A protein has these predicted regions:
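Catalytic-core environment of secreted peptidases
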Residues: 67-91, 99-105, 109, 173-175, ...
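Bacterial N-terminal signal peptides
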Residues: 10-20
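Active-site-adjacent substrate-binding region
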Residues: 218-230, 237, 241-242, 247, ...
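Soluble metallo-hydrolase cores and metallopeptidase-like ectodomains found primarily
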Residues: 56, 140, 146-171, 272-358, ...
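N-terminal capping segment at the start of a domain
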Residues: 48-88, 261, 350, 448-454, ...
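Metal-dependent peptidase/peptidase-like ectodomains
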Residues: 134-137, 151-156, 174, 178, ...
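Noncatalytic luminal/extracellular "stalk/propeptide" segments of secretory-pathway proteins
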Residues: 29-56, 75, 79-215, 416
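Second-shell loop/turn segments in exported
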Residues: 57-65, 79-90, 127, 145, ...
């Protein structure tokens, strides 16, 4: 027995000795691979060919296009809840309703997240304006957001004031108190010779694929003049605080692509910026009036005909330190190695107060909710976690998504240069460097819908060249439902920027314009009737496919290099000692203290 045991022991030792080189080789192989394996998967080489699950495409298309519930969500949100101004009771109601609906459809971890203090809560209860003399006329008007109340109906003589620069204020000292002031020049109302409702044609979509070598300077000019206009508005507000008129009437602006007449009023401005902060509060009631009504009073006054106005602005303030909240919910990942990684989608839930915020951005909200419903209905088991974010505070400065990103992923410090501190926070330049959190490496992408009710025609790549061949393959089976276009261009002004700013792939879809810029954007006409059912069904279907693809791939989506705004000044500085024969300019010695 002992001899047999010795033989067995000897054999075992021999096997171990034979195995040692193999084990050592495996160990060396693991060690040599570990630096590569330690990298986030978005840094690894991407496959040339995407694994497309055509069965999943078809299942999502069938559920999204044949069994949609998107319009039911739309009616409940727009008709049942209504306007959703940040800080208002309605936006709180919408936060809670979306949370409960997402939980009811099968999402997990449905909750609200506080993104911080916003400012004053406010509601418009009722507003009406009429001309009492020289004729009776009922006018179209609404209170500017965060306007104080008139505390009952008032009657006053109309006075038009023309203030284009600081010194113009002096002309009206001692004249505005007790009057109803018309503030703003009468703009030209041109014929609407182009359709207010438009879809992209093939030529326009092809034009979108061209990358402009020089950025358009229109917005730069706007920014350059903005500090002057902000300072002027502040001085006008101070003037009205010192010599208070009964109320101020402002004309509705024009639409970006036409429109802004025919009873449509764009109600997204007041007397100053950040008027939801107590320190910037408007000193007197302010309303925005239809351009045709404003024009009649303007012409009468300029013909020296006295005009008497009656009006009542009934508004309610609800506190100076209201907080903003985002609605968050998930479909949990199931792959043990990938479930901690996240694919996000979202839209902003808040709106302006003049209507029910249907196209801006109830449409994006209900499309995002429908995406989650589709995936839950199909009992999709994503490898990565799919997370929805419905943001508030977008209309005032993209606060909700920026707050969420700062809490979870990182943030970019803003410039504190004197000229920058004069601007609203959402317009200040990033100063850097980025401050990132560990979660930033765990999110694959964020997909956003916020361009109205139009169907999806493609996607803005935000200059992410590595993503182009991937998305090109994703949209190939979607061309029959209108998705054809990828553009390297950036687009801005909405929540994907919060993610893009900290190095996370953030995307906004290209959507048909419809009447978004001409009739509904921030207007009193932004109601359920402006929603296009087939377009919303298509948008939810397309986004569900994008989200599913991102959640099921082996790797996270590739990223652009991290932004370094702190290096911008250095990178843009003129080259030194470049010109032959140029003499050095002596540096001025520092003054002695």
């Amino acid at each position: 027995m002992a001899r047999k045991e010795n033989i067995l022991i000897s054999a075992a030792v021999g096997l171990i000795l034979l195995a040692l080189p193999v084990l050592a080789a495996e160990k060396n192989k693991t060690n040599s691979a570990s630096p590569e394996m330690a990298k986030p998967s978005y840094e690894l080489p991407q496959p040339a060919t995407e694994t497309i699950d055509y069965t999943m495409y078809q299942r999502i298309r069938d559920e999204g296009l044949r069994h949609s519930h998107v319009m039911e969500y739309a009616s409940a949100l727009m008709d049942g809840i209504g306007e959703r101004l940040t800080g208002s009771p309605n936006v709180k109601w919408a936060n809670e309703w979306t949370r409960d609906q997402l939980a009811a459809m099968g999402c997990t971890n449905a909750h609200l997240e506080d993104w911080g203090e916003f400012g004053m809560g406010w509601q418009q209860i009722n507003t009406w304006v009429r001309m009492a003399s020289p004729d009776n006329a009922v006018f179209i008007a609404q209170a500017a957001p965060w306007s104080p109340s008139t505390n009952g109906a008032i009657t006053g003589q109309a006075l038009w004031v023309d203030i284009k620069k600081d010194t113009d204020i002096d002309k009206y000292k001692g004249k505005v108190a007790g009057k109803i002031v018309l503030l703003g020049e009468m703009r030209e109302v041109k014929p609407e010779d182009k359709p207010l409702f438009q879809r992209y044609d093939a030529e326009q979509l092809d034009k979108l694929t061209e990358y402009p070598l020089k950025p358009q300077g229109e917005f730069d000019e706007y920014l350059k003049d903005l500090p002057r206009r902000l300072a002027l508005q502040k001085k006008i507000a101070q003037f009205f605080a010192a010599e208070p008129p009964l109320a101020v009437i402002m004309p509705s602006r024009a639409g970006r692509d036409g429109g802004g007449s025919g009873g449509t009023i764009f109600v997204d401005r007041g007397l100053g910026w950040s008027v939801y902060k107590r320190e910037n509060a408007m000193p007197v009631p302010v309303v925005v009036m239809a351009i045709e009504n404003y024009g009649r009073v303007y012409r009468l006054l300029n013909a020296n005909v006295p005009v008497s106005i009656e009006m009542d602005v009934d508004t309610k303030f609800l506190g100076d330190h209201e907080h903003g909240f985002d609605t968050i919910a998930e479909i949990p990942g199931t792959d043990p190695k990938l479930k901690d990684e996240v694919v996000m989608l979202g839209a902003h839930l808040d709106s302006w107060a003049a209507a029910t915020g249907a196209t801006d951005n109830g449409a994006g909200t209900v499309v995002s909710m429908e995406v989650m419903r589709i995936l839950n209905a199909l009992q999709v088991k994503p490898r990565r976690t799919i997370r929805i974010g419905l943001w508030t505070g977008e209309e005032e400065g993209i606060y909700g998504s920026a707050g969420y990103v700062k809490q979870h992923f990182g943030f970019v410090p803003l410039s504190t240069a004197p000229d920058q501190l004069k601007l609203p926070e959402w317009l200040r330049k990033p100063a850097g460097p980025l401050e990132l959190k560990p979660e930033q490496q765990k999110i694959s992408a964020y997909f956003n819908v916020d361009n109205g009710s139009g169907m999806i025609r493609g996607i803005y790549l935000q200059e992410n060249a590595a993503i182009a061949p991937i998305f090109k393959q994703w949209i190939q089976p979607l061309k029959d439902i209108g998705v054809t276009t990828l553009t390297m261009r950036n687009t801005g002004g909405t929540d994907h920027e919060s993610f893009d700013n900290v190095g996370i792939p953030g995307f906004q879809f290209i959507q048909d314009k419809l009447d978004y810029s001409t009739r509904t954007h921030h207007s009193n006409m932004d109601t359920y009737e402006r929603l296009q059912e087939p377009d919303l069904e298509q948008a939810a279907t397309v986004e569900a496919i994008f989200v599913s693809n991102a959640a099921m791939r082996d790797q996270m989506l590739p990223r652009k290099p991290l932004p370094h705004p702190e290096l911008e000044e250095q990178r843009n500085a003129p080259l030194k000692k470049l010109m032959p024969g140029a003499e050095d300019v002596p540096q001025k010695a520092p003054e002695q203290m």
